């Protein structure tokens, strides 16, 4: 509280001194401060605020398909001794290094960059970057990201600039939303001439909080906009991400004060099949919600449609399919590619070594089945299945009677519903009663295999 009062007193002094001192008060990156000395304070009529992570810059988050939901929640938990994924500078640092070798649009949101440049060039506008990342840990890194971008793009002195770059000062609040609202309140008090305030953010709950904040202000003069931005993200290379996660877990275990905070990593059983892309997973999730809304007497709710990814199994988890069938699917039954045992084994090696993504297979989803869970699991009240048909003239293979889209829930490194789902797939003609969809849904899948990383109790605990 004393730190906060001191911060407020500095703000009051800044207000009396003039020269846009509020920018100095909140700015976190000395090299990024650009005070518009040539513009009188009373001439500032607009404040434009840009979030950094996934709004302006493609900050990498954990790749959902790589981890069980339990582990994903652990990795992103701020209660871990090292603060979790979002408090670990290494992931952001890795993304910045990758950005040096990529086109501008790969790592930076071109639409937001354009808006930011227009904001900075407008004489009546103050433009700032505002992020909930902690100032003490990340200010140099975000400064480095901006400077790297300008150097890589060969920007002029006034291109891709902001008046200030503001990170979270823990003296104000440890909560990002509250911190951002305090900053906006201070700017509104400092610049009574403000007539417009626009804030861009990728998180809907933040946008909703800002709208509530603006509604609570008694400022009829102010035209405000809380603008949701589609999350802009890029994953790190898979092997690099996994290596960094393992290192993060080792650090966590070395810093943990209690054994309950320690955990090891282990793989779930390997699964082989046609792995749905994220967009197709989303389409099928929406279809389930629409179906449940139509069901008479059932209140609408949003089921957790398994864990990523949904897939069409070729075999029971933990089991393989014949190498010849792998070669046939991989080559779309081009006999020239598997006319010898050596060629078959070569394709099989590629299949098991490479990440899914090279072999694309399209399906049409025609039917849906929603079944009450066999063991009435609270986390999984329903089992959901989709019947799929491969595209014409495309060789496909499965050990099951039909091509069925499904998924799993995981408990530690075990597939929690393995027996139930496998039994359904084997006896699908008798056990599953299909409901035809109004319209078929085209989906995109990758022929491949995957296993998730899971958290298990630490063996040294």
UniProtKB/Swiss-Prot annotation:
Cellular component, GO, one term: nucleolus
GO biological process: box C/D sno(s)RNA 3'-end processing; rRNA methylation
InterPro entries: SAK_HAD, YMR265C_C
One MF annotation (Gene Ontology) recorded for this entry: RNA binding
Protein name: Uncharacterized protein YMR265C
């Amino acid at each position: 509280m004393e730190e906060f009062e001191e911060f407020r007193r500095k703000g009051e002094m800044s207000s009396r001194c003039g020269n846009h001192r509020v920018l100095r008060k909140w700015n976190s990156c000395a090299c990024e401060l650009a005070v518009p000395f040539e513009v009188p304070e009373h001439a500032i009529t607009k404040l434009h605020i840009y979030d950094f992570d996934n709004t302006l810059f493609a900050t990498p988050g954990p790749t959902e398909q790589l981890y069980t939901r339990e582990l994903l929640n652990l990795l992103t938990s701020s209660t871990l001794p090292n603060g979790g994924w979002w408090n670990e500078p290494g992931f952001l640092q890795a993304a910045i290094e990758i950005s040096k070798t990529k086109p501008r649009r790969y790592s930076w949101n071109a639409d937001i960059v354009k808006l930011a440049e227009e904001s900075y060039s407008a004489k009546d506008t103050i433009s700032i970057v505002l992020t909930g990342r902690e100032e003490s840990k990340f200010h140099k890194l975000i400064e480095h990201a901006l400077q790297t971008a300008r150097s890589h793009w060969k920007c002029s002195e006034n291109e891709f600039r902001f008046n200030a770059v503001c990170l979270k000062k823990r003296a104000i609040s440890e909560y990002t939303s509250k911190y951002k609202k305090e900053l906006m309140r201070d700017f509104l008090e400092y610049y009574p001439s403000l007539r417009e305030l626009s804030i861009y953010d990728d998180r809907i709950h933040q946008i909703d909080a800002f709208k509530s904040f603006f509604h609570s202000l008694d400022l009829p003069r102010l035209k405000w906009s809380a603008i949701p931005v589609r999350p802009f993200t890029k994953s790190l290379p898979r092997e690099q991400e996994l290596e960094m996660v393992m290192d993060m877990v080792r650090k966590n275990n070395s810093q943990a004060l209690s054994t309950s905070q320690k955990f090891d990593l282990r793989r779930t059983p390997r699964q082989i099949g046609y792995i749905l892309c994220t967009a197709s997973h989303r389409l099928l999730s929406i279809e389930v919600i629409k179906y449940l809304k139509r069901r008479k007497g059932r209140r609408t709710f949003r089921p957790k449609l398994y864990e990523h990814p949904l897939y069409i199994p070729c075999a029971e988890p933990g089991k393989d399919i014949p190498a010849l069938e792998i070669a046939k699917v991989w080559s779309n039954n081009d006999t020239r590619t598997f006319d010898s045992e050596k060629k078959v084994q070569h394709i099989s090696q590629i299949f098991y070594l490479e990440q899914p993504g090279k072999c694309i297979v399209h399906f049409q989803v025609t039917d849906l089945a929603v079944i009450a869970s066999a063991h009435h699991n609270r986390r999984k009240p329903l089992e959901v299945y989709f019947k799929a048909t491969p595209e014409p003239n495309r060789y496909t293979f499965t050990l099951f009677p039909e091509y069925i889209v499904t998924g799993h829930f995981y408990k530690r490194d075990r597939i929690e519903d393995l027996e139930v789902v496998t039994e359904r797939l084997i006896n699908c003609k008798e056990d599953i009663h299909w409901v035809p969809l109004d319209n078929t849904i085209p989906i995109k899948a990758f022929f491949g295999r995957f296993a998730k990383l899971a958290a298990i109790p630490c063996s040294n605990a």
